[in-house]
Amino acid sequence: MRRQGGTCLAAWLVLFTAAAGRAQPPASTLPVPELRPPAGEEAPRMPFLDRPLESVPPAADFVPMPEGGPPLRYPFDPPLGFTGPSGVLPRGEQGDSDFVPVEDRWRLGLPAWDRYGKGHPLLDDYPYALGAWYNPFKQNVLKGDYPIIGQHTFLNVTGLSLSLVDQRQVPTGTTPFESTARAHQEEFFGSPNQLVYNQFLFLTLDLFHGDASFKPIDWRVLVTPVINVNTLNVDELAITNPNVTKGTQRDRDFFTLQEYFVEAKLADLSPYYDFVSLRVGSQPFISDFRGFLFSDVNRAVRLFGTAFSNRDQFNLAFFRQAEKDTNSQLNSLQDRGQDIFLANYYRQDFIFPGYTMQASLTYNHDPASFKFDRNNFLVRPDPVGTFTPHTLDVGYVGLAGDGHIGRYNITHQFYYAFGHDSHNPLANQAQSISAEMAAVELSYDRDWVRFRTSFFWSSGDHNINDGHATGFDSILDNPNFAGGQFSYWQRQAVSLFGVNLVNRLSLIPDLRSSKIQGQSNFVNPGLLLYNIGFDADITPKLKMINNCNFLWFDSVEVLKQFTFDRGIDSRIGTDISSGYQYRPFLSNNAVVLFGISALIPGSGFKSLFDRKDNTVNPPVAAFVQMNFVF
């Protein structure tokens, strides 16, 4: 084998030498290179050795600046968007043509560029475009894109117009002891039709000091004044006001400072932008992923920050609740006296990448008080049973998770409530509180469709007379769950004998007079909910949200004693809803929401709201909401 290899190598060498000899031209035609240059001369540089960094412009094109003359002025291009006046003071002037001082590095100009040669049509995407103060889509000093003072102080001005038209049908009692809206009304429950118009105007001024996007801000001052105008039209008396002479229409307006706070970073906890900050004033806060327990904007002192390269987040907050306006649900300047303490801790990538766990502790102290709302209805204490002012002291222990495990999305929440109620109006005695709540949602994304299923349970009270309140209730919830604002059961406040069977934007049938002004009630029937639904991104601009909820009371013993009806069943009914979100500009600057829903009554709902002929028409509701943001 080794001998054959040597023979082959020798053959290849012979062939290569012969070929080279045939390809070599005669000696007379070969150039003879000069190995050494003549004496006193440099060796010539071949062209292929030239490098771009060593190129020199022709001497004829170079015109030196005269010494002592004015420095060379370079052309100035305007910066992009709307920059406003610079807040950086110049520290020097240009002294020569080689150095041009640029103090405000944020407002560097760029030349105009018509990328496609079309003359910049309105709907085409062009780089290096100039803007105006009223254009939030381009760089704008009013949107925090350029500093207004120095290099690090920015102002973000945000305007929001929220318009809501809500047409709904809810069981509505008549006024059997006073005049009715129409003659010869015999039914206890009259016309269910109601029409609501709500208009909000928000203006947020956010002044903050900071650097880049990933670094937490050093300090912030924020103020949000709000104007609200609302109108309610109903078909029955004593809905807008207990005084039937006030009619069936109510017009209200309200102005307030909804948000106002100052924020300061107290310390950096690591080189990886971990920090701890303090925020004092009226501010938004949501206690968990979906808003099951507490979701509000109110007066607070909040300590918050991150740890372990932003993998962990924490909050410590104390809320001193301000009284709410009845019709706009905005904060008033009146103190309510309710104290809420919250602490939670988040851990990202817990066991599974993309899955976040949360543990929380909450304490609610709601002292005894006596309160009529702006429409002259009694809201504290609840106007049922022996309505005596009472004090609530309740603690909540929570454990939650949100994220995805592989291709499956999961959200879950558990709360255990414990504490004491000095005198529950329904039970007519003091109560020791021990109640639970659990929720879970599973979903799977398939192309442009998300398929969902979820379950919700809040425990009910099985014995109203035993002194132990086991019906779970929240503090001020606003759950984004099982359809959320598109669901009939969550969106509508269904009243029942002076209180609400379920409050607006809540899941729990807690028999409270008002979610925003009443007190938590742990003597309630509780809820079992099973949901199936799907969300579909029909186009990049249009999204559809569909849900079907099956509803049961967890326990009907409280309702049986409250209504003096032993025949109440646990089946509430089936809630069917469909919602649409339309974004005409593919952004959240303009969003139109539309929703329609209906509740197909079950035997339990029928026994509470049936008519003389033992029938209940399925209530239907629809709404249109338009959000325009600058």
Predicted features along the sequence, with ranges:
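Short loop/turn motifs that connect adjacent beta-strands in outer-membrane beta-barrel proteins
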Residues: 122-157, 168-172, 208-221, 266-276, ...
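Outer membrane beta-barrel
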Residues: 200, 204-324, 409, 442-491, ...
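Bacterial N-terminal signal peptides
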Residues: 8-18
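Signature for the C-terminal beta-barrel architecture of outer-membrane proteins
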Residues: 272-274, 283-469, 528-530, 537-540, ...
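C-terminal structural cap/anchor segments
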Residues: 455-458, 462-571
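Outer-membrane beta-barrel "beta-signal"
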Residues: 578, 616-630
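Extracytoplasmic loops and strand-loop junctions of Gram-negative outer membrane beta-barrel proteins
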Residues: 140-143, 179-192, 241-246, 283-285, ...
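N-terminal periplasmic/intermembrane-space "pro-region" immediately following the signal or transit peptide
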Residues: 21-217, 447, 451, 463
